[in-house]
């Protein structure tokens, strides 16, 4: 699992916290940040440089002219897919926790309202 990350020398992909991707000239710069250890001010990170792939494509759709375009490297695309799996998993866990807490707060308010309603009904019965 995570063969592309391991080929970059990342032996513990589960310690990845986040990543950033930017373009500089004809290169894409990938920076991977790892979870901070206690007492560290900055997260450990590693940087990788990927040359952009150049392609010549039809410019006007009729075949009259051509233009050169640059695309992200296929290898980088595979690495980003793996990074997205890792980073999305963490976000999904946080979102699930937030949903459970929201459901719990909603349940508390529903129960509190029902208790007030039942107490009001009891109060009506005791007045008669």
Swiss-Prot record:
This is UPF0325 protein CKO_03204. Transmembrane segments: none annotated. NCBIfam families: PRK13677.1. Belongs to the UPF0325 family. It comes from Citrobacter koseri (strain ATCC BAA-895 / CDC 4225-83 / SGSC4696). It holds the Pfam family DUF3461.
């Amino acid at each position: 699992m995570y063969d592309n990350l391991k080929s970059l020398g990342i032996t513990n992909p589960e310690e990845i916290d986040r990543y950033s991707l930017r373009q500089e000239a004809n290169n894409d710069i990938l920076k991977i940040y790892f979870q901070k250890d206690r007492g560290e001010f900055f997260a450990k990170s590693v940087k990788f440089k990927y040359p952009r792939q150049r392609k010549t494509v039809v410019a006007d759709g009729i075949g009259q002219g051509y233009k050169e375009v640059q695309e992200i490297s296929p290898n980088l695309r595979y690495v980003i897919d793996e990074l997205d799996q890792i980073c999305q998993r963490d976000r999904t866990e946080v979102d699930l926790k937030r949903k459970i807490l929201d459901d719990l707060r909603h349940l508390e308010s529903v129960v509190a309202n029902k208790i007030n309603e039942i107490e009001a009904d009891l109060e009506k019965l005791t007045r008669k």
